[in-house]
Amino acid sequence: MALTKERKNEIIEAYATKQGDTGSPEVQVAVLTEQITTLNDHLRTHKKDHHSRRGLLKMVGRRRNLLTYLRNKDVSRYRSLIERLGLRR
């Protein structure tokens, strides 16, 4: 199932650095992570859905680029985001 507006707004509020913040790397990575998780569950049941798999790989690449940017810009923000999202165990 796709990400609903309500769920997306919850994620934005949880990871925003200030009021109305939708473009910070933290928010973008959090939204992408939620979309990746949802799409991953979809692909577990629909193994031959290659179009969605391609979209998943694009999202993973975009998230990786944003995380690299954040790591180079501010390591403490990067580490706290990784810990909050449960990435890189």
UniProtKB/Swiss-Prot annotation:
Q: How does it assemble?
A: Part of the 30S ribosomal subunit. Forms a bridge to the 50S subunit in the 70S ribosome, contacting the 23S rRNA.
In this record, what's one Pfam family? Ribosomal_S15
Keywords of the record, alphabetical order, are: Ribonucleoprotein, Ribosomal protein, RNA-binding, rRNA-binding
The text of the family note is: Belongs to the universal ribosomal protein uS15 family.
| Protein name as catalogued | Small ribosomal subunit protein uS15
What is this protein for, i.e. what is its function?
Answer: One of the primary rRNA binding proteins, it binds directly to 16S rRNA where it helps nucleate assembly of the platform of the 30S subunit by binding and bridging several RNA helices of the 16S rRNA.
Keyword rRNA-binding listed? The answer is: yes
**Keyword match Acyltransferase:** no
MF (Gene Ontology): rRNA binding; structural constituent of ribosome
Q: For this UniProt entry, which residues form the secretion signal?
A: none
| Recorded name of the encoding gene | rpsO
Protein's GO biological process: translation
Q: Where is it found, in Gene Ontology cellular component terms? A: cytosolic small ribosomal subunit
InterPro entries documented for this protein: Ribosomal_uS15, Ribosomal_uS15_bac-type, uS15_NS1_RNA-bd_sf
Q: Looking at the record's lineage, which domain of life comes first?
A: Bacteria
NCBIfam families, per database record = S15_bact (TIGR00952)
